[in-house]
Amino acid sequence: MARVTVEDCLEHVDNRFELVMLSTKRARQLATGGKEPRVAWENDKPTVVALREIAEGIVTNEFIAAEEIVTEDPVFAAFEDENNEAV
């Protein structure tokens, strides 16, 4: 198992706060969203896999945004549009 450090991740992310948000979103995708990891799982927890993906430059904010757009539920989006209409 390769050890991942914050410094490795910060080479691809602007600051620690953005790193926390990005790794949290990606770990949640891996754990509950049914997304496939882009690196070998190696019996790690989703958080570690997410950090390894970030450290290798595979996962970025743009990657997460694209994944969220693709997985958006069209039924929920239609319901949300109906509720946002002016009365």
Curated annotation (Swiss-Prot):
Keyword Membrane annotated: no
Name listed for the protein in its UniProt record: DNA-directed RNA polymerase subunit omega
SMART domains in the record: RNA_pol_Rpb6 (SM01409)
GO function terms (MF aspect): DNA binding; DNA-directed RNA polymerase activity
Signal peptide (UniProt feature, chain positions): none
An example Gene Ontology biological process: DNA-templated transcription
Cystine pairs: none
Organism field: Pseudomonas putida (strain ATCC 47054 / DSM 6125 / CFBP 8728 / NCIMB 11950 / KT2440)
Keywords carried by this UniProt record: DNA-directed RNA polymerase, Nucleotidyltransferase, Transcription, Transferase
InterPro entries from the UniProt entry: DNA-dir_RNA_pol_omega, Pol_omega/Rpo6/RPB6, RPB6/omega-like_sf
Catalytic activity from the UniProt record: RNA(n) + a ribonucleoside 5'-triphosphate = RNA(n+1) + diphosphate
Top-tier EC class: transferase
Coiled-coil stretches: none
Known partners and oligomeric status: The RNAP catalytic core consists of 2 alpha, 1 beta, 1 beta' and 1 omega subunit. When a sigma factor is associated with the core the holoenzyme is formed, which can initiate transcription.
Taxonomic placement: Bacteria, Pseudomonadati, Pseudomonadota, Gammaproteobacteria, Pseudomonadales
Stated role: Promotes RNA polymerase assembly. Latches the N- and C-terminal regions of the beta' subunit thereby facilitating its interaction with the beta and alpha subunits.
One of the record's GO cellular component terms: DNA-directed RNA polymerase complex
EC number annotated for this UniProt entry: 2.7.7.6
